[in-house]
């Protein structure tokens, strides 16, 4: 079992139950999944960009991502239907907790000029989104072997009903929120 998963069961559930006066342990919010998404608009010109991005995301997440394709043609962006324009991976269970642990303890402190993450990036339904500007903050990516700096979106989906509950859940996992 992952370190953060044990921490959630032993400490976080009790703390959140006391804070929000839940009647059952099943009411306590938990993280359902983490989705990593890389949008690659440059992939229209060069197909190798998709391969490099898939390789990077595989190293970061520990599982192979799905290549996302354009749903409809947009002439202004020179995109036809079915063109590969990004890649994404969904993490659940033990892999999700392992990624979250590495993200909080290793990757976030490596961000340049890091002062904490915004507490306002909740969507109103208890889910949190973080934008990462460069993939080199992850220790699995070797700086010398990348072809270009690429950002990604990390979506954390929780069972929390409100943003306050979700923020309390992520704060219990030691997310470095800005004050």
UniProtKB/Swiss-Prot annotation:
Similarity comment: family membership: Belongs to the universal ribosomal protein uL5 family.
Keywords assigned by UniProt? Ribonucleoprotein, Ribosomal protein, RNA-binding, rRNA-binding, tRNA-binding
Which terms under GO biological process does the entry name? Answer: translation
| HAMAP family, per the entry | Ribosomal_uL5_B
- InterPro entries from the entry? Ribosomal_uL5 (IPR002132), Ribosomal_uL5_bac-type (IPR020930), Ribosomal_uL5_C (IPR031309), Ribosomal_uL5_CS (IPR020929), Ribosomal_uL5_dom_sf (IPR022803), Ribosomal_uL5_N (IPR031310)
Q: What does this protein do?
A: This is one of the proteins that bind and probably mediate the attachment of the 5S RNA into the large ribosomal subunit, where it forms part of the central protuberance. In the 70S ribosome it contacts protein S13 of the 30S subunit (bridge B1b), connecting the 2 subunits; this bridge is implicated in subunit movement. Contacts the P site tRNA; the 5S rRNA and some of its associated proteins might help stabilize positioning of ribosome-bound tRNAs.
Q: Is Ribonucleoprotein one of the keywords UniProt gives this record?
A: yes
**GO cellular component labels:** ribonucleoprotein complex; ribosome
Quaternary structure and partners: Part of the 50S ribosomal subunit; part of the 5S rRNA/L5/L18/L25 subcomplex. Contacts the 5S rRNA and the P site tRNA. Forms a bridge to the 30S subunit in the 70S ribosome.
The protein's name is Large ribosomal subunit protein uL5
Which terms in the Gene Ontology molecular function aspect does this entry carry? rRNA binding; structural constituent of ribosome; tRNA binding
Determine the domain of life of the protein's source: Bacteria
């Amino acid at each position: 079992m992952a370190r953060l998963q044990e921490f959630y069961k032993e400490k976080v559930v009790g703390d959140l139950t006391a804070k929000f006066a839940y009647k059952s342990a099943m009411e306590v919010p938990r993280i359902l999944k983490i989705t990593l998404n890389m949008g690659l608009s440059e992939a229209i010109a060069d197909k190798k960009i998709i391969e490099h991005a898939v390789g990077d995301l595989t190293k970061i997440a520990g599982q192979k991502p799905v290549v996302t394709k354009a749903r409809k043609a947009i002439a202004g962006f020179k995109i036809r239907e079915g063109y590969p324009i990004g890649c994404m991976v969904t993490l659940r269970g033990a892999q999700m907790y392992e990624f979250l642990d590495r993200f909080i303890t290793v990757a976030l402190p490596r961000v340049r000029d890091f002062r904490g993450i915004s507490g306002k990036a909740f969507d109103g339904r208890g889910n949190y989104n973080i934008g990462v500007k460069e993939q080199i903050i992850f220790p699995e990516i070797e700086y010398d072997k990348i072809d270009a700096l690429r950002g990604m979106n990390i979506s954390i989906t929780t069972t929390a009903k409100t943003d306050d509950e979700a923020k309390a859940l992520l704060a219990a996992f030691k997310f470095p929120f800005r004050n």
